[in-house]
Amino acid sequence: MSEKRPLILLPAVDVVEGRAVRLVQGKAGSETEYGSALDAALGWQRDGAEWIHLVDLDAAFGRGSNRELLADVVGRLDVAVELSGGIRDDESLEAALATGCARVNIGTAALENPQWCAKVVAEFGDKVAVGLDVKIVDDQHRLRGRGWETDGGDLWEVLDRLDSEGCSRYVVTDVTKDGTLQGPNLDLLGRVADRTDAPVIASGGVSSLDDLRAIATLTDRGVEGAIVGKALYAGRFTLPEALAAMGQ
């Protein structure tokens, strides 16, 4: 990539029973609640977001769904939405795409149902991103599925497989960092970006504007955007401050 592009910021709205929440390390039961999901999403739009990362955590954990609410949220927004959580088969994928979201993020299904994932990547192209939720154990990069409860194999093997199938984009999370405000795993992001030609979106750990500036140094290696959640909700910085820091 020759042209230096500003890092795209995607404020996260994680939804449990219709409310915006943040988890610590993706663990069910660690929620901090931040009010209505719709109000949160509209607030980020008002603050200048061009993208919203909208997650149905109930669907991701297999304990229900906020499908109708999320469709309403997408319909009320004028900005692009990346929709994630529990998209594991044709029916849930079609329902997600029918909301009018810009793209969907597939996680567990890419690990548990690789043939289906290959089919939808081929069929829907840029409308499908794959979430790579990584847990580093004894220097092994392992993928996690089912709301990070199950082992999904070796990161590098799965990444090479998805690349060969033409996956258009990856959302990369270090699950030990997510919701902790401990800073992103820049080494992991850089290594994934170097291994694939597809753009990478960073997720997890952002705690400060300096963290965003650090991720932005990886744009020429293929890191396209960063999902920001807890730091915004906890008031570490505002979205306008973050956009200004990214030159937007």
Curated annotation (Swiss-Prot):
Q: Which UniProt keywords apply?
A: Amino-acid biosynthesis, Aromatic amino acid biosynthesis, Cytoplasm, Histidine biosynthesis, Isomerase, Tryptophan biosynthesis
* Gene3D superfamilies (UniProt xref): Aldolase class I (3.20.20.70)
Mention one GO molecular function.
phosphoribosylanthranilate isomerase activity
Q: Which chemical reaction does it catalyze?
A: 1-(5-phospho-beta-D-ribosyl)-5-[(5-phospho-beta-D-ribosylamino)methylideneamino]imidazole-4-carboxamide = 5-[(5-phospho-1-deoxy-D-ribulos-1-ylimino)methylamino]-1-(5-phospho-beta-D-ribosyl)imidazole-4-carboxamide; N-(5-phospho-beta-D-ribosyl)anthranilate = 1-(2-carboxyphenylamino)-1-deoxy-D-ribulose 5-phosphate
Q: What is its EC number?
A: 5.3.1.16, 5.3.1.24
Top-tier EC class: isomerase
Carries keyword Magnesium? no
Q: In which pathway does it act?
A: Amino-acid biosynthesis; L-histidine biosynthesis; L-histidine from 5-phospho-alpha-D-ribose 1-diphosphate: step 4/9; Amino-acid biosynthesis; L-tryptophan biosynthesis; L-tryptophan from chorismate: step 3/5
Principal place where this protein is found?
cytoplasm
What is one GO cellular-component annotation here?
cytoplasm
Q: Which domain of life is it from?
A: Bacteria
InterPro entries tied to this protein: Aldolase_TIM, His_biosynth, HisA/PriA_Actinobacteria, Isoase_HisA-like, Isoase_HisA-like_bact, RibuloseP-bd_barrel
Q: Which Pfam families match?
A: His_biosynth
Task: Report the locations given in the UniProt record.
Answer: Cytoplasm
Q: Where is the active site?
A: D14, D133
User: What's one GO BP annotation on this UniProt entry?
Assistant: L-histidine biosynthetic process
Could you confirm whether the keyword Chloroplast appears in this record?
Answer: no
Role: Involved in both the histidine and tryptophan biosynthetic pathways.
What the entry lists under HAMAP family is as follows: HisA (MF_01014)
The record's family statement is: Belongs to the HisA/HisF family.
NCBIfam families, per the entry? hisA-trpF
Protein name as annotated: Phosphoribosyl isomerase A
Q: What is the lineage of its organism?
A: Bacteria, Bacillati, Actinomycetota, Actinomycetes, Mycobacteriales
Gene behind this protein: priA
